[in-house]
């Protein structure tokens, strides 16, 4: 191999190694920002064709469901709130410290983001749907596939 080809080969190898390293670093940096979406029944029973995809403790995720009537417990001394999210086949407890959205109420559809701890979600953000007719696409798709008839479970009173 002459010197010219050897240099060309070294440049190509260096570029490929650099691209591989950059891709690895980007993936490592983004892994903490990836939030997977689950419904309460998927957290309890798993999802996929054989229900093998079950989230593990410490995993960051988003859970969407309806706030169970009678489950909201507020701590009078702090902003801590505990409530349960449900769908047709499961119930998951959520603990949250902070100010809840104005539209948060029992029977309302919400999405909570946080870390799963022993089957309960320790939430750091709660999002409430803004209109009775609006459902986030992720929740609507999950309800259509797994939980038919849940869209009209409870109409909020005014």
UniProtKB/Swiss-Prot annotation:
<feature type="transmembrane region" description="Helical; Signal-anchor for type II membrane protein">
    <location>
        <begin position="9"/>
        <end position="29"/>
    </location>
</feature>
<keyword id="KW-0201">Cytochrome c-type biogenesis</keyword>
<dbReference type="GO" id="GO:0020037">
    <property type="term" value="F:heme binding"/>
</dbReference>
<keyword id="KW-0472">Membrane</keyword>
<keyword id="KW-0349">Heme</keyword>
<dbReference type="GO" id="GO:0046872">
    <property type="term" value="F:metal ion binding"/>
</dbReference>
<keyword id="KW-1003">Cell membrane</keyword>
<feature type="binding site" description="covalent">
    <location>
        <position position="130"/>
    </location>
    <ligand>
        <name>heme</name>
    </ligand>
</feature>
<comment type="similarity">
    <text>Belongs to the CcmE/CycJ family.</text>
</comment>
<dbReference type="InterPro" id="IPR004329">
    <property type="entry name" value="CcmE"/>
</dbReference>
<comment type="function">
    <text>Heme chaperone required for the biogenesis of c-type cytochromes. Transiently binds heme delivered by CcmC and transfers the heme to apo-cytochromes in a process facilitated by CcmF and CcmH.</text>
</comment>
<keyword id="KW-0408">Iron</keyword>
<feature type="topological domain" description="Cytoplasmic">
    <location>
        <begin position="1"/>
        <end position="8"/>
    </location>
</feature>
<dbReference type="InterPro" id="IPR012340">
    <property type="entry name" value="NA-bd_OB-fold"/>
</dbReference>
<feature type="binding site" description="axial binding residue">
    <location>
        <position position="134"/>
    </location>
    <ligand>
        <name>heme</name>
    </ligand>
</feature>
<keyword id="KW-1133">Transmembrane helix</keyword>
<dbReference type="Pfam" id="PF03100">
    <property type="entry name" value="CcmE"/>
</dbReference>
<dbReference type="GO" id="GO:0017004">
    <property type="term" value="P:cytochrome complex assembly"/>
</dbReference>
<protein>
    <recommendedName>
        <fullName>Cytochrome c-type biogenesis protein CcmE</fullName>
    </recommendedName>
</protein>
<keyword id="KW-0812">Transmembrane</keyword>
<keyword id="KW-0479">Metal-binding</keyword>
<dbReference type="GO" id="GO:0005886">
    <property type="term" value="C:plasma membrane"/>
</dbReference>
<keyword id="KW-0997">Cell inner membrane</keyword>
<dbReference type="InterPro" id="IPR036127">
    <property type="entry name" value="CcmE-like_sf"/>
</dbReference>
<keyword id="KW-0735">Signal-anchor</keyword>
<feature type="topological domain" description="Periplasmic">
    <location>
        <begin position="30"/>
        <end position="158"/>
    </location>
</feature>
